[in-house]
């Protein structure tokens, strides 16, 4: 990494909708301009995907700058650590020739997900659509501090001091909640800890020292602002703070170094699990269908076997259109494989998020998915711009474009229909569009120096 002589800075990147906006691919494109990519919230419930020419790289806890060998990676104290998942991820990356030694640093203040947390989440989390990775119970025990006269939460620093005592206490806590044999889980965690331990630091100003030396940091948010534990719609939220301002608490850096906030959205809204999705295609019917599919373990393969997306589009009803869009744009959860509920782009929601959370610029992924509407009866792209009376949605319609005119390289101009839509969107959002996604591959991201 280049050695800078002046004080560095930090930017924060967050999702502006309900998750799965393609934040990782934007981080991957921006990473070369930073010295450190840092995570500040969440844990193994985050599914970040980077599509490369060699295949798909799926990450849950390691920051998305892994493909840039000169970039350091940091997991801040606001994240919870699933030892088994993180160790598996580190080993998976090593198997692909990506060595994290000397690159990855983890705060020793990160809480550890315990067997009791997995068991609790899998028993109680299904109704609100959690991933079952124990994230919520881990954060809850961190806040509770004590249960039954004993500590209820442990951080990596506790393992550093006395791992045997901590694992023994974790076993006792789990045994109080479930009859399942916990010994196997504890043994797997002991083994995973040996993989994770070399990356843990007890230096609370590790990231600050880098920035004081000139390092440029990009904080990578997990989940999205609409799922924030406070600002989101309870109880259908994640269990951590997802907002840009929290990056400096969970990322272990004073906020004085903040430079700008980057928001990522996508041209079709989607959501995994239960909770409000005002523009959902198929409304309650779609929500119930996706909930049943999640409980029964049905996803991409099941829908591919049952449905022809083009036939669904020809039917013309919102529910069928939603299934078709999900199939054609691969809207299935990265971390879970569950079908995502699909809705129209909600411009009013984006406007509020941008204003409320201080977003300076926007990236819009999945613009290629809008070509689906060329196969609908009216051949128009519907965009929700608000409600007239609190109930009926006000929808604007833009001419659709065919999939065949989507550019495959930067030299090919955008379809005029898409260009018109993007210019309008940048104007109503009041923020510059810095880039758009035109397909899943790394090369299918187009960056703008000026407005499209």
UniProtKB/Swiss-Prot annotation:
UniProt binding sites for Mg(2+): 20, 47
Gene Ontology biological-process annotations: 'de novo' AMP biosynthetic process; IMP metabolic process
UniProt key word Transport: no
Catalytic residues, chain numbering: 20, 48
Subcellular location: Cytoplasm
Domain of life: Bacteria
Molecular function terms, GO-annotated: adenylosuccinate synthase activity; GTP binding; magnesium ion binding
Pathway: Purine metabolism; AMP biosynthesis via de novo pathway; AMP from IMP: step 1/2
Essential cofactor(s): Mg(2+)
Top-tier EC class: ligase
Family classification: Belongs to the adenylosuccinate synthetase family.
HAMAP family: Adenylosucc_synth
Name listed for the protein in its UniProt record: Adenylosuccinate synthetase 2
Species in which this protein is naturally found: Cupriavidus pinatubonensis (strain JMP 134 / LMG 1197) (Cupriavidus necator (strain JMP 134))
Lineage of the organism: Bacteria, Pseudomonadati, Pseudomonadota, Betaproteobacteria, Burkholderiales
Gene that specifies this protein: purA2
């Amino acid at each position: 990494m280049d050695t800078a002589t002046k004080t560095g800075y930090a930017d924060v990147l967050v999702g502006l909708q309900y998750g799965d906006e393609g934040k990782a691919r934007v981080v991957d494109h921006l990473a070369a301009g930073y010295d450190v990519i840092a995570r500040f919230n969440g844990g193994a419930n985050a599914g970040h995907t980077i599509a490369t020419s060699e295949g798909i790289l799926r990450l849950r806890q390691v920051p998305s700058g892994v493909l840039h060998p000169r970039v350091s990676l940091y997991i801040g104290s606001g994240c919870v650590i699933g030892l088994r998942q993180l160790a598996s991820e580190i080993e998976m990356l090593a198997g692909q020739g990506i060595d994290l030694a000397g690159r990855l640093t983890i705060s020793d203040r990160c809480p550890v997900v315990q067997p009791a947390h997995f068991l609790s989440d899998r028993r109680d989390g299904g109704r609100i659509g959690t991933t079952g990775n124990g994230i919520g119970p881990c954060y809850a025990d961190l806040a509770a501090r004590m249960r039954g006269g004993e500590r209820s939460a442990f951080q990596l620093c506790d393992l550093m001091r006395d791992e045997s005592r901590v694992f023994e206490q974790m076993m006792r806590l789990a045994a109080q909640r479930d009859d399942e044999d916990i010994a196997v889980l504890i043994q797997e965690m002991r083994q995973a800890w040996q993989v994770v331990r070399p990356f843990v630091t007890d230096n609370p100003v590790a990231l600050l020292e880098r920035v004081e030396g000139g390092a440029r940091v990009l904080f990578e948010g997990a989940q999205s602002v609409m799922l924030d534990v406070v600002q989101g719609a309870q109880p259908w939220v994640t269990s951590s703070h997802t907002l840009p301002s929290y990056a400096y608490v969970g990322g272990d850096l004073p906020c004085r170094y903040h430079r700008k906030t980057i928001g990522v959205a996508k041209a079709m809204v989607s959501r995994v699990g239960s909770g409000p999705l005002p523009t959902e295609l198929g409304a309650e019917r779609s929500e119930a269908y996706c909930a049943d599919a999640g409980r029964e373990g049905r996803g991409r393969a099941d829908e591919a076997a049952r449905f022809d997306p083009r036939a669904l589009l020809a039917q013309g009803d919102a529910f069928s259109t939603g299934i078709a869009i999900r199939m054609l744009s691969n809207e299935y959860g990265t971390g879970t494989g569950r079908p995502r509920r699909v809705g129209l782009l909600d411009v009013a929601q984006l406007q509020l998020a941008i204003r409320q959370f201080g977003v300076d610029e926007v990236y819009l992924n999945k613009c290629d998915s809008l070509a689906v509407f060329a196969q609908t009866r009216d051949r128009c792209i519907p965009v929700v711009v608000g409600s007239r009376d609190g109930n009926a949605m006000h929808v604007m319609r833009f001419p659709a474009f065919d999939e065949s005119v989507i550019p495959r390289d930067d030299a090919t101009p955008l379809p005029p229909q898409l260009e018109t839509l993007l210019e309008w969107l940048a104007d109503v959002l009041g923020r510059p569009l810095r880039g758009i996604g035109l397909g899943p591959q790394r090369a299918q991201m187009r960056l703008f120096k000026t407005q499209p």
